[in-house]
């Protein structure tokens, strides 16, 4: 112990304190954890990753899923599912990992009306609840798994979701004997829900592309055709992670669908002539 520091009441220790939000949906904390290895039907072993979101006030798991990759697209699917069920939080609490700290995440949070707080390095108390939950999950769920019983992500997912349901409905020592589920639903006026259409638009990825002279843009090595009025311009695009829905963002913010380039079909399309206005004669 540094006696001089004690006498002078100074310290180099950071001020880290436990905290708890007073109301539900104020803060959702998200994190990823490695799961078990899963041997699929092809005979190969694959590492499984678990992505989860916990409500700070209630310890209720609002979102969770299993994946073979820990990336932003999979994180977004967990957030989308949680928001569809329970509405949006006021704030997301994440670490500085690449899946969590990126432009797409910032755009997503802004669209749904949430803000993001990124933890400072070496401050474990800032996401203590989600890390403690992962430890509990590993002790209670993973430790009892016989991984030979599972041959697909869907099978493992179903087993994990059953465990999460049991956890959410069990009394919690930090909640004075209440279950996370009872605590979470004790404040029904604090659910800020979004419509299905809002969710569909908010959870689109966004990029910019330069349009070619013949009105073509490329995403993931696939060519798409846009309206000829965008030729040679730099445009903003929004698209679903599976690339089933793609849109040009118009100047007024509306979304105009675009389609795959079809060169054979274009060979029979009559081209529009450009008419230049010469004024009244």
Predicted segments with their positions:
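Mobile-element integrase/transposase regions
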Residues: 1-54, 58-61, 72-78, 85-90, ...
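Acidic/histidine-rich, metal-coordinating catalytic segments
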Residues: 86-104, 120
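A short acidic/small-residue loop/turn micro-motif
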Residues: 67-71, 263
């Amino acid at each position: 112990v540094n006696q001089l520091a004690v006498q002078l009441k100074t310290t180099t220790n950071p001020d880290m304190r436990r905290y708890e939000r007073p109301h539900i949906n104020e803060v959702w904390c998200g994190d990823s954890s490695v799961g078990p290895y899963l041997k699929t039907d092809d005979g190969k072993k694959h590492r499984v990753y678990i992505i989860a979101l916990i409500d700070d006030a209630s310890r209720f798991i609002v979102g969770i899923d299993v994946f073979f990759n820990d990336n932003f697209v999979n994180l977004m699917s967990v957030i989308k599912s949680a928001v569809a069920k329970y509405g949006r939080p006021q704030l997301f609490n994440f670490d500085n990992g690449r899946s969590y700290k990126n432009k797409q995440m910032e755009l997503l949070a802004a669209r749904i009306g949430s803000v993001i707080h990124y933890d400072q390095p070496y401050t474990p108390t800032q996401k203590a609840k989600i890390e403690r939950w992962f430890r509990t999950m590993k002790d209670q769920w993973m430790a009892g798994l016989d991984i030979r019983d599972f041959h697909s992500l869907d099978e493992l997912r179903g087993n994990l979701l059953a465990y999460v349901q049991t956890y959410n409905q069990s009394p919690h020592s930090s909640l004075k004997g209440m279950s996370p589920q009872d605590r979470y639903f004790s404040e029904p006026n604090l659910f800020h829900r979004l419509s299905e259409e809002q969710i569909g638009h908010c959870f689109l990825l966004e990029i910019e592309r330069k349009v070619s002279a013949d009105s073509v843009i490329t995403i993931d090595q696939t060519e798409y055709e846009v309206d000829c009025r965008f030729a040679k311009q730099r445009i903003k695009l929004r698209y679903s992670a599976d690339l089933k829905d793609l849109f040009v963002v118009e100047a007024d913010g509306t979304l105009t669908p675009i389609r795959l380039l079809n060169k054979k079909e274009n060979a029979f399309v009559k081209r529009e002539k450009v008419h230049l206005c010469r004024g009244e004669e």
